[in-house]
Amino acid sequence: MFIKRCSRSIFLQVVIGLVIGVLCGVGIPDLAVQMKPLGDGFIKLIKMLIALIVFCVVVNGISGAGDLKKVGRIGLKSVIYFEILTTIALVLGLVVAYSLGLGSGANIHLNELPAGDIALYTGRTQEIHGPVAFLMGLIPTSVFSAFAENDILQVLLFSVLFGSALNLVGEQASGVARLINEFSHIVFRIMGMIVRLAPLGVFGAVAFTTARYGVDSLSHLGALVLVFYATCLVFVMAVLGSVLRLSGVRMLPFLRYFREELLIVMGTASSDAVLPQVMRKLEHMGIRSSTVGLVIPTGYSFNLDGFSIYLTLAVVFIAHVTGTPLAMTDLLTILLVSLVTSKGAHGIPGSALVILAATLTAVPAIPVAGLVLVLSVDWFMGIGRALTNLIGNCVATVTIARWENDIDLPRAQAILDGRLEAPTRTGGEPLERGVVAGEGKLQG
């Protein structure tokens, strides 16, 4: 009975993969470190299709949306929402770290820190884009380069323009619209095949990480990790929970609905690995595809709530550990600098540590050499960052859809309460373009 249930449930398969990965990492570390390609390969397979999925979803949504003014309104509301929520996250991290005196009393001297370990990150702070360079970076050199480099913001810009053009041309372009809609079914079917490999990918990632880092790396920096996770939990349940409640949705059923995706993120420390499945599930809840297609890809670059908490928390922690006194002006400087640098993460490998280095560099009072203190626990904190970022973007989509009346709320509540069946497997077919999902089987 259990084996039959496992064969049908991706969630249970991922749990088993995670547990076996931990056991392998602890019991057979030499073998476990060789499992890294399994996790890396799974994420690469997912990323292979992300640009195509964003293109299909956005074009299908906008071409069938009718009013293009609505598309612009959704974009503007999304940017305003992202800025407000990430600012709250930055302030929360700052207040928690400062009020708890996180790191105080460690008395670590700068000459004790191995500065060479941070050169990899401090040397790349110039990759953080300024406002003008960032905006220019949204425009691809060519359409093909945007897809070839997997630059999601550039793909999103082209997709919005392409979908808008289809919308304006109207009936004459109906054949192209149908072709893209049919093509999206093929892409999502491929994604469904790839997602079946999630248990293997999670096993490889967890086995390698457990063997490589173990639990010893948490011993000296446990307070930082625990406070970070506690702060993320408060943000998710109190802040995001309140926002979601205003939209008529409860947080716990909402999290249960995305449990498979959250577990995959927990195993891979990457929210990219579940972007396509999340978009599909939000559409299945009854949210218009055009809204999902605009909010989720944009949020992956601009709405980084977990990263925002991490940034200010880590900066204040490093200041306290190195014995650097912080005046009110220093705290304001940290906040203002973080507001800018936290938006520069897009497209930078190892962006968390690079942007942390850039933030420390921009706040002269805090020694950038302190970055080395968080290196050993960055992967553990990366899980919390990815989970919080993902939940934040899902909540953002529901909230903005509610503002725009683009969500079938009774359907969403029925799915979350278990009265309407959720997708039986992750990564299946996309919903029809430009319509609010209305199909499903009510359970008696």
From Swiss-Prot:
<feature type="transmembrane region" description="Helical">
    <location>
        <begin position="221"/>
        <end position="241"/>
    </location>
</feature>
<keyword id="KW-0812">Transmembrane</keyword>
<comment type="function">
    <text>Responsible for the transport of dicarboxylates such as succinate, fumarate, and malate from the periplasm across the membrane.</text>
</comment>
<dbReference type="GO" id="GO:0015138">
    <property type="term" value="F:fumarate transmembrane transporter activity"/>
</dbReference>
<feature type="transmembrane region" description="Helical">
    <location>
        <begin position="354"/>
        <end position="374"/>
    </location>
</feature>
<dbReference type="GO" id="GO:0070778">
    <property type="term" value="P:L-aspartate transmembrane transport"/>
</dbReference>
<feature type="transmembrane region" description="Helical">
    <location>
        <begin position="78"/>
        <end position="98"/>
    </location>
</feature>
<keyword id="KW-1003">Cell membrane</keyword>
<dbReference type="GO" id="GO:0015141">
    <property type="term" value="F:succinate transmembrane transporter activity"/>
</dbReference>
<dbReference type="Pfam" id="PF00375">
    <property type="entry name" value="SDF"/>
</dbReference>
<dbReference type="InterPro" id="IPR036458">
    <property type="entry name" value="Na:dicarbo_symporter_sf"/>
</dbReference>
<dbReference type="InterPro" id="IPR023954">
    <property type="entry name" value="C4_dicarb_transport"/>
</dbReference>
<keyword id="KW-0813">Transport</keyword>
<dbReference type="InterPro" id="IPR001991">
    <property type="entry name" value="Na-dicarboxylate_symporter"/>
</dbReference>
<feature type="transmembrane region" description="Helical">
    <location>
        <begin position="42"/>
        <end position="62"/>
    </location>
</feature>
<feature type="transmembrane region" description="Helical">
    <location>
        <begin position="307"/>
        <end position="327"/>
    </location>
</feature>
<comment type="similarity">
    <text>Belongs to the dicarboxylate/amino acid:cation symporter (DAACS) (TC 2.A.23) family.</text>
</comment>
<feature type="transmembrane region" description="Helical">
    <location>
        <begin position="190"/>
        <end position="210"/>
    </location>
</feature>
<feature type="transmembrane region" description="Helical">
    <location>
        <begin position="380"/>
        <end position="400"/>
    </location>
</feature>
<dbReference type="GO" id="GO:0015366">
    <property type="term" value="F:malate:proton symporter activity"/>
</dbReference>
<dbReference type="InterPro" id="IPR018107">
    <property type="entry name" value="Na-dicarboxylate_symporter_CS"/>
</dbReference>
<keyword id="KW-0769">Symport</keyword>
<feature type="transmembrane region" description="Helical">
    <location>
        <begin position="9"/>
        <end position="29"/>
    </location>
</feature>
<keyword id="KW-1133">Transmembrane helix</keyword>
<protein>
    <recommendedName>
        <fullName>C4-dicarboxylate transport protein 1</fullName>
    </recommendedName>
</protein>
<keyword id="KW-0472">Membrane</keyword>
<keyword id="KW-0997">Cell inner membrane</keyword>
<dbReference type="GO" id="GO:0005886">
    <property type="term" value="C:plasma membrane"/>
</dbReference>
<feature type="transmembrane region" description="Helical">
    <location>
        <begin position="152"/>
        <end position="172"/>
    </location>
</feature>
